[in-house]
C-alpha cells in the first residue's frame, strides 16, 4: 500500500501524500467557485444598473429637442458600450468558472480512479 506513485508534476508521492493532496485539492475547489460566482454577481449587478442607464438614455433620445439629439445619442452609445462590456466580463468569468470546474472534475476523477484501483471498496469520508 506504500507503493510510490508519480504525480502530474513528475514527483513521487506516497499513498499518504496523495491522500493529503486529494484533501487539499478538494478544499480549494469551493474557494475558486465562490470567487467566480462573486465576480459574476458583481458584473451582473453592474450590467443591470447600466441597462437602467441605457433605458434612460434611450428615452432621452426620444424626448429631447432636436438640438440635443447628438449629445443624447452619444450618451446612449456610451451606455450601450458600457453595458456590453459588463455583459462580456460576466460571460468571460462564467467561462472561466466552467473551465475551472471541468478541470477540477477531471483531476478529481483521476484521483478517485487511483484510489479505487488501489482499494476497490474505498469510499472517501465526507
Swiss-Prot record:
For this UniProt record, give its keywords in alphabetical order, as a comma-separated list: Chromatin regulator, Cytoplasm, DNA damage, Nucleus
What protein is this chain from? Pdp3-interacting factor 2
Q: Which domain of life is it from?
A: Eukaryota
- What is one GO cellular-component annotation here? nucleus
Question: Could you describe the subunit structure of this protein?
Answer: Component of the mst2 complex composed of at least eaf6, mst2, nto1, pdp3, ptf1, ptf2 and tfg3.
Q: Which GO terms describe its biological process?
A: chromatin remodeling; DNA damage response
Name where it's found: Cytoplasm; Nucleus
Name of the coding gene:
ptf2
**Per its database record, what is this protein's job?**
Component of the mst2 complex which is a highly specific H3 lysine 14 (H3K14) acetyltransferase that functions together with gcn5 to regulate global levels of H3K14 acetylation (H3K14ac), critical for DNA damage checkpoint activation.
Amino acid at each position: 500500500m506504500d507503493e510510490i506513485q508519480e504525480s502530474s508534476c513528475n514527483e513521487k508521492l506516497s499513498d499518504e501524500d496523495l491522500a493529503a493532496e486529494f484533501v487539499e485539492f478538494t478544499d480549494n475547489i469551493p474557494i475558486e467557485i465562490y470567487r467566480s460566482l462573486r465576480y459574476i454577481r458583481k458584473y451582473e449587478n453592474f450590467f443591470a444598473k447600466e441597462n437602467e442607464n441605457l433605458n434612460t438614455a434611450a428615452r432621452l433620445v426620444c424626448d429631447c429637442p432636436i438640438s440635443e439629439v447628438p449629445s443624447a445619442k452619444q450618451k446612449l452609445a456610451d451606455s450601450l458600450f458600457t453595458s456590453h462590456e459588463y455583459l462580456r466580463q460576466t460571460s468571460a468569468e462564467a467561462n472561466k468558472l466552467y473551465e475551472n470546474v471541468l478541470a477540477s472534475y477531471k483531476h478529481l476523477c483521476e484521483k478517485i480512479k487511483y484510489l479505487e484501483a488501489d482499494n476497490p471498496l474505498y469510499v472517501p469520508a465526507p
